Amino acid sequence: MENNEAPSPSGSNNNDFPILPPPPNANDNYNQFGDHQIRNNNAAQKKLQQTQAKVDEVVGIMRVNVEKVLERDQKLSELGERADQLEQGASQFEQQAGKLKRKQWWANMKMMIILGVIAVVLLIIVLVSVWPSSSDSGSGGGNKAITQAPPH
């Protein structure tokens, strides 16, 4: 019996296991599976390259986004500083406006007092000039009642 033949049913073989065909030639295995493995490797490498390209694209986008976030943070800091400066300037303006308002109120009050005093002085002058003086009425040259005796 040759190695390629199946065992006889009578069991003339020393063991009860069937005889297996010889393993394929190593060169035959490479030719059958090598081309398939190379194709699989090429496909895997292509997928890997595509994935790497996508990762590189995402990394680039993320870098741009991080730069934008940093720029935004810097602009917000500058805006906050400007807001603080404007608030301080507004506070100073409010204080100065209050002082100026009080100063103008006092100036207006002084002017009203001066005008009031001038008006009182003018009124006194007018009253004195129109009212006869007390010295004129006591000299006898004033209004005397004329009495005449009846003619006889």
Swiss-Prot record:
Cytoplasmic side of membrane: 1-110
User: Gene3D superfamilies from the xrefs?
Assistant: 1.20.5.110
Classification via CDD domains: R-SNARE_VAMP2 (cd15870)
Which is one GO molecular function term here?
SNAP receptor activity
Q: Where are the transmembrane segments?
A: 111-130
Pfam families per UniProt: Synaptobrevin
Q: Does the keyword Transmembrane apply?
A: yes
Topological type in the membrane: Single-pass type IV membrane protein
Describe its PTM? Ubiquitinated by gzl, regulating endocytic trafficking. In wing imaginal disks, ubiquitination by gzl promotes transcytosis of wingless (wg) to the basolateral surface.
The subcellular localization recorded is:
Cytoplasmic vesicle, Secretory vesicle, Synaptic vesicle membrane; Cell membrane
Instruction: Indicate yes or no for the key word Iron.
Output: no
**Free-text tissue specificity from the UniProt record:** Not nervous system-specific; abundant in cells of the gut and Malpighian tubules.
Vesicular compartment: which residues?
131-152
Question: What phenotype is described for loss of this gene?
Answer: Cell lethality.
Q: Where is the composition biased (Polar residues)?
A: 1-16
Record key words, sorted: Cell membrane, Coiled coil, Cytoplasmic vesicle, Membrane, Synapse, Transmembrane, Transmembrane helix, Ubl conjugation
What PANTHER family does this protein map onto? SYNAPTOBREVIN FAMILY MEMBER
Q: How does it assemble?
A: Part of the SNARE core complex containing Snap25 and syntaxin.
Q: What is this protein called?
A: Synaptobrevin
Question: Gene encoding this chain?
Answer: Syb
